[in-house]
């Protein structure tokens, strides 16, 4: 995967596209610090275990964190 470094704000008039992956296929959080991924079966705040419909998560180097609540990601 290629990387690009920016020195200022990043602006898109057409949105951004994120990688999509299943929760069980996430790489280890410790190997992915700073990565942002859409997990297609991760839980949202209103969903129950096993019924996740997707959430954006990021790695803090220890855990995958849900962007909607700041809690550890789950499915």
Regions found by a protein language model. Give the residues of each.
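Short beta-strand segments and strand-loop junctions that repeat across beta-rich extracellular domains
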Residues: 52-61
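Repetitive beta-strand solenoid architecture
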Residues: 5-6, 12, 32, 60
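Extracellular/surface-exposed low-complexity repeats and stalk/linker segments enriched in Gly/Pro
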Residues: 11-49, 71-75
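Beta-propeller fold detector
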Residues: 66-70
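Structural motif
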Residues: 1-2, 48
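Residue-level marker of intrinsically disordered, low-complexity segments enriched
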Residues: 1, 8-9, 19, 65
């Amino acid at each position: 995967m290629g990387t690009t470094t920016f020195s200022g704000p990043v602006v898109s008039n057409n949105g951004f596209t994120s990688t999509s992956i299943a929760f069980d296929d996430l790489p280890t959080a410790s190997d992915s610090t700073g990565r942002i991924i859409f997990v297609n079966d991760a839980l949202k705040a209103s969903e129950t275990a096993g019924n996740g419909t997707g959430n954006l998560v990021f790695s803090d180097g220890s855990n995958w964190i849900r962007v909607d609540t700041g809690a550890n990601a789950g499915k």
